[in-house]
């Protein structure tokens, strides 16, 4: 069984809407990465210029996650340091940022205060993977 893990910071006290938005960003980050780098080609069509994008998805990922239930597990980290522990574990497992996991930063235009030049780190989203793999991190939250 494939599933996707997302871990969000609890200490930010995000409103339900803000939390939903940040978790949504984390959930689609792996697909957006593929779409962005998927070989854009601008073509003229009846409705104007269009992008045609080709992406490659792992067969097991497609059949066991996308074509099925798209199982997601959302957990909470106590604070930024607790969230960064997930990054450390991921790196120890040989996983790479922007390939296996994505750090999600809020631009701080509404309710959060900026923590650094990138904004505020709100959550981490992992690409969907086999449950026994992602549980190596998920079970700690």
Where in this protein do the model-derived segments appear?
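Positively charged, small/polar-rich N-terminal and surface patches that mediate targeting and assembly
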Residues: 1-141
């Amino acid at each position: 069984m494939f599933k996707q893990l997302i871990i969000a910071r609890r200490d930010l006290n995000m409103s339900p809407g803000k939390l939903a938005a940040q978790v949504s960003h984390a959930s689609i980050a792996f697909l957006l990465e593929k779409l962005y780098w998927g070989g854009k080609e601008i073509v003229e069509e009846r409705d104007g210029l269009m992008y045609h994008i080709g992406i490659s998805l792992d067969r097991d990922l497609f059949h066991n996650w996308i074509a099925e239930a798209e199982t997601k597990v959302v957990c909470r980290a106590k604070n930024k340091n607790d969230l960064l522990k997930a990054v450390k574990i991921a790196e120890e497992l040989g996983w790479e940022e922007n390939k296996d996991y994505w750090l999600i930063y809020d631009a701080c235009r509404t309710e959060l205060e900026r923590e650094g030049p990138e904004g505020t780190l709100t959550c981490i989203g992992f690409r969907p993977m086999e449950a026994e793999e992602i549980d190596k991190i998920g079970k700690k939250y």
